[in-house]
Amino acid sequence: MKSKLFISLSAVLIGLAFFGSMYNGEMKEASRNVTLAPTHEFLV
């Protein structure tokens, strides 16, 4: 019983770490695109 709980918990942690790294990568891409965008687009 304990081993099954431990395995499921570790699987959830691995999934969270994987999706967290993917999310961070997407956020970095988005912020990079925003900084590269011309400023007049935001001023209009």
Curated annotation (Swiss-Prot):
GN (gene name): phrE
Keyword terms, alphabetized: Cytoplasm, Secreted, Sporulation
Domain of life: Bacteria
Protein name: Phosphatase RapE inhibitor
Post-translational modification: Contains a predicted signal peptide cleavage site in the N-terminal region, however the propeptide is probably only subject to processing events at the ends of the mature peptide.
Compartments where located: Secreted; Cytoplasm
Main subcellular localisation: secreted
Cellular component terms per the entry's GO annotation: cytoplasm; extracellular region
Effect of deleting the gene: Inactivation of the gene leads to a reduction in sporulation efficiency.
Induction: Transcription occurs independently of the rapE promoter and is controlled by the Spo0A-AbrB pair of transcriptional regulators.
Family membership noted in the UniProt record: Belongs to the Phr family.
Biological process terms in GO annotation: sporulation resulting in formation of a cellular spore
Keyword Cytoplasm: yes
Prodomain residues: 1-30, 36-44
Protein's organism: Bacillus subtilis (strain 168)
Protein task: Signaling molecule involved in the regulation of sporulation. Secreted during production, but the mature peptide acts intracellularly, indicating that it needs to be imported into the cell to function. Inhibitor of the RapE phosphatase activity. Does not inhibit the phosphatase activity of RapA and RapB. Probably plays a dispensable role in the overall context of sporulation initiation.
Keyword Secreted: yes
